[in-house]
Swiss-Prot record:
Binding, Ca(2+) 1: D497, D499, D501, D505
Signal peptide boundaries: 1-28
Subunit structure: Heterodimer of an alpha and a beta subunit. Alpha-1 associates with beta-1. Interacts with RAB21. Interacts (via cytoplasmic domain) with PTPN2; activates PTPN2 phosphatase activity towards EGFR and negatively regulates EGF signaling.
Domain notes: The integrin I-domain (insert) is a VWFA domain. Integrins with I-domains do not undergo protease cleavage.
Protein name: Integrin alpha-1
Topological type in the membrane: Single-pass type I membrane protein
Gene: Itga1
Lineage of the species this protein comes from: Eukaryota, Metazoa, Chordata, Craniata, Vertebrata
Length: 1180
């Protein structure tokens, strides 16, 4: 291998990706985007394609995969170790892992093996690196099985594994050489042998070669099993000398090779194809034997290639016709593919390539399975994951690129069969090239482990398969499907334990090629919550929408996109990272490498409870140029503290480099404010300002600080704060003492805690109804360095100073509050979606003295969510665990009434049977116990949740004709003799947020006339796995499918009207199906129209009605009226039937016609129609 110039890799303290980023343009929390460490390498080597944080006894490192290192020829790929936390910057070092990554006893092809494209750390120390395009040669075929290596903590390859298989393209080749004196020069024959043998993979389980030389006698130069490698055979072949002799006994040489060289004693293998290559330069002296010798070779299936060297004839100017015909007769059929001739010995090397290709073609025929690949092209190691017990290796190329997951544990390797991951629907329409194993992961649940694999090309929309390992067998539990064709749903999987209880809380599934509204590859991440052994959809995450502009002519474009495709590919990398913001919950980082015209960006989402917050906490853009540095966010890892500050750091890779971002500590700052006096009493002035008496107030503001990561240590913080008086008013009613300003700004250094005092005075204003709000805003003096403020806590504090109570001349205010409540619904709430609203109207009235700080407190059941308020007259509501609404603040006067509405929405995570609300009205004023009974109201309203499903029905036939002249068969031997088949299909598809309940589907159809004649005959039904239909006695009740013969009587004629009135008189059969909860349920019923009944019946046309009725088995989960029933009408008509009109109809019609004629004649007579005016004129 030609030595290659090592890539120039330098570590710089400032991340070169972020030089062009302005801090203000990105949402920032506690990942430091200014002071980072970067590692750069050639973009053409894909340096940065994978990254992992790593620690061993030598120190802390960033491991970086570079799958195409070795440009421009070998491109084996490799892994670099990049030191961090050292006093001085040190370069990254290539580990040269492919050199020691090897599988014994195979001919390896490491070029383009993309080693380092998969890189995962081992929880027990060391790491795993894979080259999914590693191949080995089997004959002339290259099998891309992929390979993975366990690397020790000291960066040494411990062992390598790949699903290599024994080559089944084996050949036993015996070369029969003419060594007579006429062969000249002999060196040309040896050169021919060398060129031919170099092209063969020689070994005990591959091709074996033996050489026989003949002239007057036959010599075995070496046997088939003599040498076990190509190199050994070449050495032996170079030592072969010419035997000599005056005669050429070709038939003897061939027959000896057949009888002796192809025996097991000389290394021939049973069942292996036999090949003989005969090289000669003249006619044989025993050609009379050739015909029988060749027939014996044919009988033993020996393929023969014959080579005629014409040098002796050309040098003697002799005719070659007879010689060529003899050598052609030796070759196997077809002769044109098995016979060669060369002008002389020197020209032998010119046919080596063609001869080799034709011999190699026999290898392919020896392995008939080569047409359909199993693990030969598996690309094992395309993805990898360490679970508790198993190492999971994705093998996307297995089974004709359907893919599989190789499970390895210690020395055990489980390679699932092609059908192992096929679900029942998939067997009917087997997916091709679904790439199962594109990514793999696992989830830990109490007492078990779930294994997860993605197949992004399944059914073109993608799928995720969840399964368990039970005694080495795979048991599929669930599949999750994508929603958009080509989105690559399932190409990225990550599981995460948010609350650190050792059990998985979420599964995140990436669909990085999800198309946005403008056909840009926006990308999408689906979040699923773990519920026992199943995953339930929770939410979707999307990036900032990218504007795709190929030309600046578009007015909305501000920057032209130079790179295609446009978009973000959000979800290309999804990493579960340890608690970044030190809030006790683990976090998620998602890469969007195509953002900003292929520069790339990442998004950080903080964990909360058992899920993540839907809004991202921080977006880190690359700032790269999209060429020398691009696809920032291609790889992410954040598991370790690499600089010793106790905080998790994040490593982000792209093509051309990687960056290590340090996390900043989180400062917890809490502020309290107290006032003396704590109420404003205008009647009691306590100071003079500018010669006027007024009310002065002393404010004490205390700051308490600590670091989240070091709560027990003393922390000193430099803060800047600003105090604003009467902050709710545009014009303030108070100023700070000694100034005429409502605002002051100061700096303070706080060591654990510190209190300061400020005084202010009230202005002579007449508006003293609303309290005075004092607002204190604070921030760190240097927000770009050191810790950051906790974003879970406010950096603004508000306190209200109320005015003194107005109770007239009384010292005590005795209020009497009443609370009246009404709701929009009283008897039953039907909830159709989480956006449905439920209003509660509250009326608070004070029948006593002024009630100060009047408020209503609302407690509600967890199936309700506070949405907002309407029509409130004063102030507003706050919602924490309870809803507290200030009513008439600061006081509710005597006789005053306030009415407002509280609006609720429904929490789809808690489906309770009742909506329960407890409301109370209270104040800071006194109220007698006997008047408190009207201060509280309890509401309990039953709730039902309308499941958003879709209920479809269809039939294969809607009209069937019965010929009038059709005859009734004497016997019914099979269902084909009964009549037309009608297939009825029912589909129930889940929609909406509510879970699917257990359902009951009742399918009714007319099966017998009133006289007991069959109408529709059920021959069977089928359904999805979650459906169970009964009774089975309805299925083929006459047993016709079982071979029972049925005799039909032709003499009977149905009473008139029996069929015509079938809708009301026919007997009805009902199939009842129980449906377990599923996103999709299907039931198909096959019915036969019993034609003998309709042939003997009198009718022209009628409808048969089939009814499907759906019912929920859960009293809380109901169905909408539009999704409960479905009816299908099948029209039956009789063709060519003459109409038979009743006699009374004929007589009545004749009488009516005569009566009408008489009336017409009478009318004409009355108007003189029958008089002749001309006759009267003549008479006159």
């Amino acid at each position: 291998m030609v030595p290659r110039r090592p890539a120039s890799l330098e570590v710089t303290v400032a991340c070169i990706w972020l030089l062009t980023v302005i801090l203000g343009f990105c949402v920032s929390f506690n990942v430091d985007v200014k002071n980072s460490m970067s590692f750069s390498g050639p973009v053409e080597d894909m340096f940065g394609y994978t990254v992992q944080q790593y620690e061993n006894e030598e120190g802390k490192w960033v491991l970086i995969g570079s799958p195409l290192v070795g440009q421009p020829k070998a491109r084996t790929g490799d892994v670099y170790k990049c030191p961090v936390g050292r006093e001085r910057a040190m370069p990254c070092v290539k580990l040269d892992l492919p050199v020691n990554t090897s599988i014994p006893n195979v001919t390896e092809i490491k070029e383009n093996m993309t080693f380092g494209s998969t890189l995962v750390t081992n929880p027990n120390g060391g790491f795993l690196a894979c080259g999914p395009l590693y191949a080995y040669r089997c004959g002339h075929l290259h099998y891309t099985t992929g390979i993975c290596s366990d690397v020790s903590p000291t960066f040494q390859v411990v062992n390598s594994f790949a699903p290599v298989q024994e080559c089944s393209t084996q050949l036993d080749i015996v070369i029969v050489l003419d060594g007579s004196n006429s062969i000249y020069p002999w060196e040309s024959v040896i050169a021919f042998l060398n060129d031919l043998l170099k092209r063969m993979d020689i070994g005990p389980k591959q091709t074996q070669v033996g050489i026989v030389q003949y002239g007057e006698n036959v010599t075995h130069e070496f046997n088939l099993n003599k040498y076990s490698s190509t190199e050994e055979v070449l050495v032996a072949a170079n030592k072969i000398g010419r035997q000599g002799g005056l005669q050429t006994m070709t038939a003897l040489g061939i027959d000896t090779a057949r009888k002796e060289a192809f025996t097991e004693a000389r290394g021939a293998r049973r069942g292996v194809k036999k090949v003989m290559v005969i090289v000669t330069d003249g006619e044989s002296h025993d050609n009379y034997r050739l015909k029988q010798v060749i027939q014996d070779c044919e009988d033993e299936n020996i393929q023969r290639f014959s080579i005629a060297i014409l040098g002796h004839y050309n040098r003697g100017n002799l005719s070659t016709e007879k010689f060529v015909e003899e050598i052609k007769s030796i070759a196997s059929e077809p002769t044109e593919k098995h016979f060669f001739n060369v002008s002389d010995e020197l020209a032998l090397v010119t046919i080596v390539k063609a001869l080799g290709e034709r011999i190699f073609a026999l290898e392919a025929t020896a392995d008939q399975s080569a047409a359909s690949f199993e693990m030969e092209m598996s690309q094992t190691g395309f993805s990898a994951h360490y679970s508790q017990d198993w190492v999971m290796l994705g093998a996307v190329g297995a089974y004709d690129w359907n893919g599989t997951v190789v499970m390895q544990k210690a020395n055990q390797m489980v390679i699932p069969h092609n059908t192992t991951f096929q679900t029942e629907p998939a067997k009917m329409n087997e997916p091709l090239a679904s790439y199962l194993g594109y990514t793999v992961n696992s989830a830990t649940i109490p007492g078990d482990v779930l294994y997860i694999a993605g197949q992004p090309r399944y059914n073109h929309t993608g799928q995720v398969v969840i399964y368990k390992m039970e005694d080495g067998n795979i048991n599929i539990l669930q599949t999750l499907g994508g929603e958009q064709i080509g989105s690559y749903f399932g190409s990225v999987l990550t599981t995460i334990d948010i609350d650190k209880d050792s059990y998985t809380d979420l599964l995140l599934v990436g669909a990085p090629m999800y198309m946005g509204t403008e056909k840009e590859e926006q990308g999408k991440v689906y979040v699923y919550a773990v519920n026992q052994t199943r995953f339930e959809y929770q939410m979707s995450l999307e990036p900032i929408r990218q504007t795709c502009c190929s030309s600046l002519k578009d007015n909305s474009c501000t920057k032209e996109n130079k790179n295609e495709p446009c978009g973000a590919r959000f979800g290309t990398a999804i990493a579960a990272v340890k608690d970044l913001n030190v809030d006790g919950f683990n976090d998620v980082v998602i890469g969007a490498p195509l953002e900003d015209d292929h520069a790339g960006a990442v998004y950080i989402y903080h964990g909360s409870g058992k899920t993540i917050r839907e809004a991202y906490a921080q977006r880190i853009p690359s700032g790269g140029d999209g060429k020398t540095l691009k696809f920032f966010g291609q790889s992410i890892h954040g598991e370790m503290d690499l600089n010793g500050d106790g905080l998790t750091d994040v490593t982000i890779g792209g093509l051309g480099g990687a960056a290590l971002f340090w996390a900043r500590d989180v400062a917890v700052v809490k502020v309290t404010m107290n006032f003396e006096p704590n109420k404003v009493n205008i009647q009691k002035k306590n100071c003079r300002v500018e010669g006027k008496e007024t009310v002065c107030i002393n404010a004490t503001m205390c700051f308490h600080v600590k670091l989240k990561s070091k709560e027990d240590s003393i922390y000193e913080a430099d803060l800047q704060y600003r105090v604003t008086l009467d902050s709710l008013r545009q014009i303030s009613r108070s100023f700070f003492s000694g100034t005429q300003e409502r605002k002051i700004q100061r700096n303070i250094t706080v060591r654990e805690s510190e209190c300061i005092r400020h005084s202010f005075y009230m202005l002579d204003k007449h508006d003293f109804q609303d309290s005075v709000r004092v607002t204190l805003d604070f921030n760190l003096t240097d927000p770009e360095n050191g810790p950051v403020l906790d974003d879970a806590l406010p950096n603004s504090v508000h306190e209200h100073i109320p005015f003194a109570k107005d109770c007239g001349n009384k010292e005590r205010c005795i209020s009497d509050l009443t609370l009246n409540v009404s709701t929009t619904e009283k008897s039953l709430l039907i909830v159709k979606s989480q956006h449905d609203k439920f209003n509660v109207s509250l009326t608070v009235k004070n029948k006593g003295d002024s009630a100060y700080n009047t408020r209503t407190v609302v407690q509600h059941s967890p199936n309700l969510i506070f949405s907002g308020i309407e029509e409130i007259q004063k102030d507003s509501c706050e919602s924490n665990q309870n809803i507290t609404c200030r009513v008439g603040y600061p006081f509710l006067r005597a006789g005053e009434t306030v009415t407002f509405k509280i609006i609720f929405q429904f929490n789809t995570s808690h489906l309770s049977e009742n909506a329960i609300i407890h409301l109370s009205a209270t104040s800071d004023s006194e109220e007698p116990l006997e008047s408190l009974n009207d201060n509280e109201v309890n509401i309990s309203i039953p709730v039902k949740y309308e499941v958003g499903l879709q209920f479809y029905s269809s039939a294969s036939e809607h009209h069937i004709s019965v010929a009038a002249n059709e005859t009734i068969p004497e016997f019914i031997n099979s269902t084909e003799d009964i009549g037309n088949e009608i297939n009825v299909f029912y589909t129930i598809r889940k929609r909406g947020h509510f879970p699917m309940p257990e359902l009951q589907l009742s399918i009714s159809f007319p099966n017998l006339t009133a006289d007991g004649y069959p109408v529709l005959y059920p021959i069977g039904w089928s359904s999805s796995d979650n459906v169970n239909c009964r009774p089975r006695s309805l299925e083929d009740p006459f047993g016709i499918n079982s071979g029972k013969k049925m005799t039909i009587s032709k003499s009977e004629v149905l009473k008139r009207g029996t069929i015509q009135d079938c809708s009301s008189t026919c007997g009805v059969a009902t199939i009842t199906c129980s449906l377990l909860p599923s996103d999709l349920s299907q039931v198909n019923v096959s019915l036969l129209l019993w034609k003998p009944t309709f042939i003997r019946a009198h009718f022209s046309s009628l409808n048969l009605t089939l009814r499907g009725e759906l019912k929920s088995e859960n009293s809380s989960l109901t169905l909408s009226s539009s999704n409960r029933k479905r009816e299908l009408a099948i029209q039956i008509s009789k063709d060519g039937l003459p109409g038979r009109v009743p006699l009374w109809v004929i007589l009545l019609s004749a009488f009516a016609g005569l009566l009408l004629l008489m009336l017409l004649i009478l009318a004409l007579w009355k108007i003189g129609f029958f008089k002749r005016p001309l006759k009267k004129k003549m008479e006159k």
